[in-house]
Amino acid sequence: MNDELMLVEPFGGILRRTRRLPERFSGNSDSMDGCGPLRRFDDMKAYLEDTMRYTREETLPEGMVLATQFLCIRKSDNRLVGMIQVRHYLNDFLRTFGGHIGYSVRPSERRKGYASWMLKNVQPYCKSLGLSEILVCCLDTNEGSRRTILKNGGRFDGTAYRADENKTLERYWITL
């Protein structure tokens, strides 16, 4: 699969490929984890500008953490199959509920190993940030994400309940 996919940051011409992703997720119960603020934007230029704010301390919104957004593109047809976001460090909320990594795969592209590939291939970037392990969380009802995390060496660390969303998250650590 290494030759089939690539992780790229959403800048320049590649950004046009994200235009249809929110439509593909709408109507689903998906939270679009790993897509950054994409759901809030119709205008991709505005999305790009907002995403850039999370890459530098001087423009980072208050209470947020530095983050790098990646698109997962299938090379054979230049199709956007998923997104993954790396949070450079954890604040109190992310330490409990979000973790270092969030990811989503386009519903029509699921069960093809793309989430596992993204999680594996973003790990060298995490190491380059000085991280020795990463926290990855998933809903306790999301068997696919659980399998993805376990396939990448995830060690179960317990659960956390989000009362505001009435959801239980499973927490896993992956050693880099």
Model-derived features: positions:
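GNAT-family acyltransferases
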Residues: 1-100, 165-176
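Conserved beta-strand-loop-alpha-helix junction that forms the acyl-donor binding cleft
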Residues: 136-146
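Conserved catalytic-core motifs of GNAT/GCN5-like acyltransferases
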Residues: 137-138, 155-170
